[in-house]
Amino acid sequence: MSRKIVLITGANRGLGRNAAVKLAAKGRDIIFTYRTHQHEAQDVIREIERAGGRAVALKLDVGDLSQFDCFISEVKNALQQHWQRETFDYLVNNAGQGHYKLFSETTEAEFDALMNVHFKGPYFLTQKLLPAIADGGRILNISSGLTRLTYPGSGTYASMKGAMEVLTRYQAKELGERRIRVNILAPGAIETDFGGGRVRDDKAVNDTIAAFTALGRVGLPDDIGDAVCAILSDETGWITAQRIEASGGQAL
C-alpha cells in the first residue's frame, strides 16, 4: 500500500514542524511550505527523513494570493517527480502569524494582513488545491482556543479563526460527496515561538494560564502534533465538520 501524502502549510517551525515529523513517523510522506528561513526547512526535511518519511519543501507566503498558481504547479510537479501521483491525501492549513493589539488600535493594514494569512489565503488556497486532493481525503484547518476564550488584544486574530470554523462546516457539507472529511483543530496556549513566544518565555503568563487549565499546565508542541496525527488517522474517518479543541481544559 502506498504511503499517504500530507500537504502542510507553515511547517518549518512550531506546531507545523512538530506535526510534520510526527506524521512521518506514522507512515505519512510530507509536502510542506515555508515562507522564510530555508535553512529551517532543510532541517525539517532531515527530521522527516529520519522519522521514515519522504519530504518536499516549497516556498509560499499564504498571505500573498498572487503566488498560488505557481505554487499549485510546484505541488503537481513534486507529486509527479517524487511519488508518480497526481493527487495528495491530506491538507493541513496551519500557516499563521500572531497578533496582540486592542480592537481600538488595530489598523486596516494589520487587519488585512491577518485576513489574508488566516482566512482569505486558506480559503482560496484550498479551493485551488481541490482538484489535487484525492477523493476520500482529509482537510484539517487550524483554529485557536481564542475563538472560545476572550483575551483583550486577540480579537482580530480570533475573528479570522472564527471565520475558518464556520467555513469548515460548509467545506465538510459541500465536499462530502467526494468523501473528503473536513475538521478544525483549536489549540489552546502552547509553548512555541508563536506571537513572540509569550507563552513559552514569559513565566508569569505561563503560570497564569496553567493555573486555570484543568490539566495544570500549558500545552506543548507534542500535544498538538499528536492531536493532528489522531485526527488524520485511519480510525477517525467518521468524524467531519467538527471543531476539536486541544487545550488541556483551559478556562472551563
Question: What annotation goes with each model-predicted range?
Answer:
Residues 12-13:
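Conserved glycine-rich cofactor-binding loop
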Residues 28-43:
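Conserved glycine-rich Rossmann-like NAD(P)H-binding loop of the short-chain dehydrogenase/reductase
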Residues 102-103, 107-115, 205, 209:
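Substrate-binding pocket helix/loop in short-chain dehydrogenase/reductase
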Residues 126, 160, 168:
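Active-site helix of classical SDR
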Residues 144:
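Residue(s) in the substrate-gating loop at a strand-loop-helix junction
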Residues 149, 229, 240-252:
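Short C-terminal tail/terminal secondary-structure segment
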Residues 176, 181, 239-241:
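Short, small/polar-rich loop/turn modules that mediate ligand/substrate recognition or access, typified
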